[in-house]
Amino acid sequence: MKKNKDVLLKNKILKKLNIINIKNLDNIKEKLKKPDWIKIKIPVNTSRIYQIKNALRKNNLYSVCEEAHCPNLSECFNNGTATFMILGSICTRNCPFCAVFHGRPNPVNVEEPQKLSDTIFDMGINYVVITSVVRDDLYDGGAEHFVNCIKAIKNKNQVKIEILVPDFRGRIELILNIFNNALPDIFNHNIENVPRLYKKIRPGANYQRSLLLLESFKKKYCSVLTKSGLMLGLGEKDVEIIQVMKDLYSSGVTLLTVGQYLQPSIHHLPVKRYIPLSEFENIKKEALSIGFTNAFCGPFVRSSYHASFQSHLPIKNNDINNI
């Protein structure tokens, strides 16, 4: 009997790992030429970058900056900041826009929270962003591990903590109760794009489920700021973008990031369009008119880029290239 249960469980996990069927790369047209505003060169202190990379390697930690091929890696590492990725480097989903490796993840490293706390202390940073791969293989999607990391960090460091979480497969009541043990300063969950394109770019995810997660967390923990983000250039329409922003605001989200999707490799979804700077500025104005407290919009904006500024600074009419 136990053997049959084990087989069923194994098949269930395998089914989860194989829900992604990339049909999106068929009929790929010629790759779009990058416009000038996408090409950037940032002065880099390579010794500082190696210092941070070595600190991560030393404690077997990961940064989403590296794993997701973030275009801001050099700048952020050069400034001594990093977004930590917990629960390993292998994701149970295979979204065709994402560069993070997918497959069967390793067991949860119970020593990771303390190692993370020690590394943050050694780096001397005062704002921490923690994200994770999706762990559909775990009963709570990794929520308890997030809480353990928050506890360990706060025990040793005087820092603000932002968490960027997956959708936990809709186990909302369970994860809300788990987070009651330790709360972040900012709760971030990316909506990513418009609902019409979800089957194409976020197989395994659900637009309404993501909205409900954000709304439910805000209702239960009203003192915690909620945040979300979109990436553009995958075929969405202006009217759809505006509706998503309205949906997010109605769900209690007050902090917003909007950036340009950049294709990590030829094996990922191609860019349909590069959004001009003027359009990002219009999106920012629209977001503020909807009611968002803070909106960072620009080609290189990512969820955790300049996150510490967004967490406590009022909106200013800064040049969009400096965001």
From Swiss-Prot:
Essential cofactor(s): [4Fe-4S] cluster
Keywords for this protein: 4Fe-4S, Cytoplasm, Iron, Iron-sulfur, Metal-binding, S-adenosyl-L-methionine, Transferase
Binding locations of [4Fe-4S] cluster 2: 91, 95, 98
Enzyme class label: transferase
Cofactor detail note: Binds 2 [4Fe-4S] clusters per subunit. One cluster is coordinated with 3 cysteines and an exchangeable S-adenosyl-L-methionine.
Positions in coiled-coil regions: none
Entry GO MF terms: 4 iron, 4 sulfur cluster binding; lipoate synthase activity; metal ion binding
Binding residues for [4Fe-4S] cluster 1: 65, 70, 76, 304
GO cellular component, one term: cytoplasm
Reaction it catalyzes: [[Fe-S] cluster scaffold protein carrying a second [4Fe-4S](2+) cluster] + N(6)-octanoyl-L-lysyl-[protein] + 2 oxidized [2Fe-2S]-[ferredoxin] + 2 S-adenosyl-L-methionine + 4 H(+) = [[Fe-S] cluster scaffold protein] + N(6)-[(R)-dihydrolipoyl]-L-lysyl-[protein] + 4 Fe(3+) + 2 hydrogen sulfide + 2 5'-deoxyadenosine + 2 L-methionine + 2 reduced [2Fe-2S]-[ferredoxin]
Biological pathway: Protein modification; protein lipoylation via endogenous pathway; protein N(6)-(lipoyl)lysine from octanoyl-[acyl-carrier-protein]: step 2/2
EC number(s) reported in the record: 2.8.1.8
InterPro entries noted in UniProt: Aldolase_TIM, Elp3/MiaA/NifB-like_rSAM, LIAS_N, Lipoyl_synth, rSAM
Pfam families cross-referenced by the UniProt entry: LIAS_N (PF16881), Radical_SAM (PF04055)
Domain Radical SAM core, first and last residues per copy: 77-293
Chief subcellular location: cytoplasm
Xref: PROSITE patterns: RADICAL_SAM
Entry's localization field: Cytoplasm
Family: Belongs to the radical SAM superfamily. Lipoyl synthase family.
NCBIfam families (UniProt xref): lipA (TIGR00510), PRK05481.1 (NF004019), PRK12928.1 (NF009544)
Protein name as catalogued: Lipoyl synthase
Organism field: Buchnera aphidicola subsp. Acyrthosiphon pisum (strain Tuc7)
